[in-house]
Amino acid sequence: MKKLGKYGKKVSCVVIGMLCAAAIGACGSTQSGSQDEKDVRNDISVYEEGADLEGTLTYGTLFIEPQTQHMIDLFMKEHPGVKIETKVVFDNDVTDEQYNEGLNTLLTELASDQRADIYDATYLPSEIKTKGSGYFEDLNQYIDADPNFNRDDYYDNILRAAEVDGKLYQIPEGFYYVMLRLNRNITDELNYEVPDEMDINDLYELYQQAKPIADDDFTIDVQNNIYVFLPMTEDRAYLKKEEVNFDSENYADFLRKMQELYQYQLSYATHAFTDIKSFSGKSVLLNTFTNLLEGSTSGMFEETDTATKPILLKSTDGKIPFWRIGEDFSMSSGCKDKALAWEFIKFCIGQKQFEFEDANSDSYYRNFFTYGSMLNKENTRQLVAYQLENDDDTAEKWEAYNEKVSAKAFRDLQLDSILTEIRNECMEQKITPEECAKLFQQRAELYVNE
């Protein structure tokens, strides 16, 4: 890589039509260099490739994940002139009360002049992340201004799905989506044509068809995962941007179907569970799993003697949701060195060349984080090639599935916990689906308008 002097030369790009800052006390850039190289008003400054970086950044988060600390250490090792200080609220497990107190501490910091330069926005309430609060920069501006950032190197559909009104306030480090396999002992007898994607309506219809031929202890999903994934998938479709429309016949219909399916659900782990690709008898309709490379990857996209091919779980609006994995990187509007902050975010999601045998001993982090962000296509291909031992056919299918994802699942921790409590009452038939939908509407409207 070429060197461009001690501080490096920045490339400046004028962003037309930027909104005036609603940001709280946003500061201009204070990078080293001449005046015309600084971030001035509507100019977005980025470093040229190979520049020597120097400066200090602060990284704020509730928890520091091992993979993030790993990236911080790698970045400082690669750029000795850079120091990244972490501002972490918790360093271990906490109670719900402590969590809420810590979150309030983080929100108070965000509204002050003591806020960090970069944040992991994963745990922040949705209105802080998405309602134009002015807390965070639109990272699309930096992507567009940086000649060294190529969207084709990333799953751009994920970046687009994470946008709010065309603005990218957070970049997810990685993502996963949900797939399911149906029990072929049931689908073969029904002569059921297995689709590529299914939503709640498809599953409900198949369940009704299967009941007459199924075993007496028939249940939809032995591990109850479907009752977690379906609401997460569907809620996203009814809470878009600042619009809330839970109070609709369509959502009440979704709840009615969920409620009916739930009544047939047996106790957790009633049936023996061994392999997502294997069914015994006709007591279970499906197994759910994520796209993560876990367990045996042999034949992961093929049908087996007792299980169908993987089927993507979608919402009723036809979109394939993704869930974030790892961090959601955000640049504070008060960041004091935005060009340097962008270099760090870009580094965290960029291509990495890792020695697989030197991976973290923890299999979870070894598989999904040690090799860099799965948002980067080449990182994913490296991992797939390693896990699948150059199984090109499976790797191509993996790529095709990743490219189909089009929607970010609604999952705000605070609101999600409120809605879950209400939904549980509906599932237990303490309230009707219509009452549940109305309560959802009231609580969600209050929440997004706070």
Question: What do these predicted ranges mean?
Answer:
Residues 51, 66, 327-412:
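Mature extracytoplasmic/periplasmic domains
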Residues 69, 253-343:
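Extracytoplasmic/periplasmic substrate-binding proteins
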Residues 81-153, 189-190, 284-285, 302:
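Extracytoplasmic "Venus flytrap"/periplasmic binding protein-like
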Residues 143-146, 158-227, 231, 237-269, ...:
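Helix-loop-helix "hinge/cap" segment bordering the ligand-binding cleft or interdomain interface
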